[in-house]
A protein has these predicted regions:
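Membrane-cytosol interface motif
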Residues: 59-77
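Short, acidic/polar linear motifs in exposed loop/turn regions
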Residues: 80-84, 123
Length: 382
């Protein structure tokens, strides 16, 4: 990178030019000499940034995924890849919205310097660490040259989770589960026998009954449906009284989602402008780390419509929001969920007492802490 002047350097350059020009114009030799001296200092500052160091830089995080509050540390290793001794330099390490300035001492050829650093994890977030940059400049801060040595690395600070073993809110069990009243000729829940009709799959002929009655008889089944759980989170800031409600809501979505994936059920998670990744629990939690509210985000009033549009086959729908929407708002949102879908609306209000109200296929629950979630779900399925 080409050396450049800092804001102080540009000010010094302006002062040097003005001093020389005014000194010569007014015949003020002292002012002209001061301007010339300042110009010499600027030239020397630029010369101190000339030359390219050869570094091998390794930015390593002990773990790319941590839970809120867990310790996250990284190691920065800088090796002098040249044969000659390097000059002292300054290393800039951006960490999220902040960063650190590390002093790099003079290194002999092939020598290494290590720095350990800690990353704050008090809040759910995706923390971007890096890129690592070396900075060479003069002691007065007039000029500097910055070189980039690494790509940025993401640290995912996952939301808190609570175990939901035994508390799944599903209504239709996956494959081996609850049968419907729809009849099928090729499913897993046996219903009855009927006369063979041309075109029936001969694999389902019941030969013992056929031999006894003298006519072909085939098996008929009850249709079983594959459970799909749809989770939808409000991202409208007007639905949340404070940040704690949002964090509780995200942790609720994450806990239910992880449990659903562990049970190998189909899952759709709607939060923000798109769907969250649900191929594995870690990927789901990675996306949960980045969830935020934004002006124009989908509020609880639009969650039911969004499920109907993006997950119409869902057998279970869970809508999660803050404490601001009224019970009437929650019921209105649930009315847009496809008919026949078991619907649960959860209101997150830190400090509130748990409550569950069920009417038909709709349940509305309130939880005050994440530890309340298993009890709320048990009341719903009970």
């Amino acid at each position: 990178m080409v050396p450049r002047l800092s804001p102080i350097g540009w000010g010094a350059l302006a002062a040097a030019v003005a001093g020389v020009a005014l000194g010569r114009g007014l015949g003020w030799l002292e002012l002209a000499a001061a301007g010339a001296a300042l110009a010499v200092v600027l030239v020397l500052a630029l010369l101190m940034t000339v030359g390219r160091e050869r570094y091998e830089v390794d930015l390593d995080l002990a773990d790319r995924r941590v839970r809120v509050g867990e310790r996250a540390v990284g190691r920065l290793t800088v090796r002098n890849a040249s044969r000659r001794r390097s000059l002292p330099a300054r290393i800039e390490l951006p960490v999220g919205a902040g960063g650190a300035d590390l002093a790099l001492p003079s290194l002999a050829g092939g020598a290494e310097h290590d720095d350990l650093f800690a990353i704050p994890t008090s809040h759910r977030a995706v923390v971007v660490v890096g890129p690592v940059r070396s900075v060479r400049g003069d002691p007065l801060g007039l000029a500097r040259r910055t070189l980039r040595w690494t790509e940025p690395v993401e640290l995912f600070v996952h939301p808190e989770l609570v175990s939901l073993t035994g508390s799944s809110a599903g209504v239709l069990r996956d494959l081996e589960g609850q049968a419907t009243r729809d009849l099928s000729d090729s499913d897993l829940s046996f219903h009855a026998l009927r006369d063979y009709v041309a075109g029936d799959d001969r694999r389902y002929i019941h030969w013992r009954t056929t031999a006894r009655q003298g006519v072909l008889m085939v098996k008929q089944f009850e249709d079983t449906r594959r459970t799909q759980t749809a989770l939808a989170l409000s991202t409208d800031p007007r639905d949340f009284d404070d940040d704690d409600e949002l964090e509780l809501a995200v942790s609720t979505i994450a806990s239910i989602g992880v449990q659903t994936l562990r049970e190998q059920r189909d899952l759709v998670v709607l939060a923000g402008p798109g769907r969250l990744r649900v191929s594995t629990p870690p990927l789901l939690l990675d996306d949960c780390s980045a969830v935020s509210v934004e002006i124009g985000g989908t509020g609880v009033s639009g969650l039911g419509r969004r499920i109907a549009r993006e997950a119409p086959a869902a057998s279970v729908a869970v809508l999660v929001t803050g404490s601001v929407p009224t019970p009437a708002d929650l019921r209105a949102a649930a009315r847009h969920v496809p008919v026949g879908t078991r619907t649960l609306v959860l209101t997150c209000s830190p400090g509130a007492e748990i409550s569950v109200r069920t009417q038909g296929s709709l349940s509305i629950g309130t939880l005050g802490t994440l530890d309340d979630l298993p009890r709320v779900l048990r009341r719903v399925v009970g």
